[in-house]
Regions:
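Conserved short histidine dyad/triad with adjacent acidic residue
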Residues: 41-64, 72-91, 125-128
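Glycine- and acidic-residue-biased ligand/ion/polar-headgroup-sensing regions
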Residues: 92-109
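Short, conserved catalytic or interaction motifs in soluble domains
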Residues: 4, 30, 110
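DNA major-groove recognition helix of helix-turn-helix/homeodomain DNA-binding modules
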Residues: 12-27, 33
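Recognition helix of helix-turn-helix/homeodomain-like DNA-binding domains
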Residues: 1-9
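Ligand-binding loop in jelly-roll beta-barrel domains
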Residues: 56-57, 68, 116, 125-147
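Inter-domain helical "communication" segments and dimerization helices
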Residues: 22, 38-40
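Short acidic-glycine-tyrosine-enriched beta hairpin
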Residues: 61, 109-125
Length: 147
């Protein structure tokens, strides 16, 4: 179903596949290995774009750094008027989110909360978690994951 475009693959599943085969997530997605070893600069708006669904857009901020220990993304999520179902996800490690613009309803391990611009959260990402954009405008947040 994924190969036929009937089903989207989540970024966490891409990360699992990459780990299993010993490659970076970026190498799996873009068929290009990272090459920077000392530092990697990402200019504003120039992150490696990863778009798996129309609602979620990821920009990798560390994609060109060899053997990076953390994944850092700017994530933009479009609001879905009337949507109440939050798709839940798990992956090994921990995650930090900082809301840059807009607001999100975040579900983590049985609890739901609203985070607004400037709010942040650090959590165990092995617990089921997911989110929705709240309001009429997209939410943009910094997502930092590490195992």
């Amino acid at each position: 179903k994924i190969e036929n475009g009937e089903l989207d693959i989540t970024i966490s599943n891409l990360m699992k596949i990459a780990r299993k085969y010993g490659v970076s997530t970026e190498e799996l997605i873009f068929a290009e290995a990272p090459h920077m070893k000392s530092y990697y600069v990402t200019r504003k708006g120039q992150g490696m774009s990863i778009e798996r669904t129309k609602a979620y857009k990821y920009q990798s901020l560390v994609g060109g750094f060899v053997n990076h220990k953390a994944d850092v993304f700017i994530v933009t999520v479009e609001p879905k008027p009337g949507a109440r179902t939050i798709y839940k996800n798990t992956h090994p490690g921990q995650e930090f989110n900082l809301v840059l613009e807009g607001a999100m309803e975040l579900y983590i391990g049985g609890k739901t909360m609203v985070l607004e611009e400037g709010d942040s959260i650090y959590f165990d990402s092995s617990k089921p978690h997911g989110m929705l954009a709240v309001g009429e405008k997209p939410v943009k947040f910094l997502a930092f994951t590490v195992e």
